[in-house]
Amino acid sequence: MNIEQFQSMLGERGISLSPRQLEQFEMYFETLVEWNEKMNLTAITEKEEVYLKHFFDSITAAFYYDFSNPLSICDVGAGAGFPSIPLKICFPHLKVTIVDSLQKRINFLNHLAQKLELSDVAFCHDRAETFGKKEHVRESYDIVMARAVARLSVLSELCLPLVKVGGTFIAMKGAAANEEIENGKYAVEVLGGQLEEVSTFQLPFEESERNILLIKKKRKTPKKYPRKPGTPNKLPIEK
């Protein structure tokens, strides 16, 4: 996906990018590749691949959810900033918090935010399990997002405690999400959520399947969740 295709395919979805926003994506790409030589941020470094599999793929969430309001977003395990930084570039009014367990990645994100002159972004070096226990952030975000971090039964325990009641947990998944959804429904329910919508589509050019899950937070998450670091992965909430 070249820059012209990136711009026109977003335009078809009603997302028009200014010259400044296109410049920010270009700087994002350059910074990502430069820092990737020093530390492992991504296996994808070829420009057209980055624009398709990182930038465009992240923004597909906006095809199924309205980001036009000044929402607060928490991105769990964003790594090199996906999906929240591409969304922030497209929708500058979003208030973004990224939680990641690796300090090196947080250093990269701080550098990136300064370089792109992003405001209303915060980067927290923490495990999602401990972050979700903190009173000032627990159940405080309009949206919590995660892209390919863990299976749904695990991911729900990391994300749903952070979503305010009435807010939305957006899980961005690859192919074969059906089985994962079936196995994850119980955890979603236990943690106060309800699966409202699953949107399945093909990423352009390579035709690989993507699934975007919209999970509504219906009631408060029981206080015992999330459990201590590592436990959700070892003992997921499954029937």
Swiss-Prot record:
Gene Ontology cellular component annotations, sorted alphabetically: cytosol
InterPro entries (UniProt xref): rRNA_ssu_MeTfrase_G, SAM-dependent_MTases_sf
The protein's enzyme class: transferase
Protein localization: Cytoplasm
Tagged with keyword Cytoplasm: yes
A Pfam family that the UniProt record links to this protein: GidB
Protein name: Ribosomal RNA small subunit methyltransferase G
Gene label: rsmG
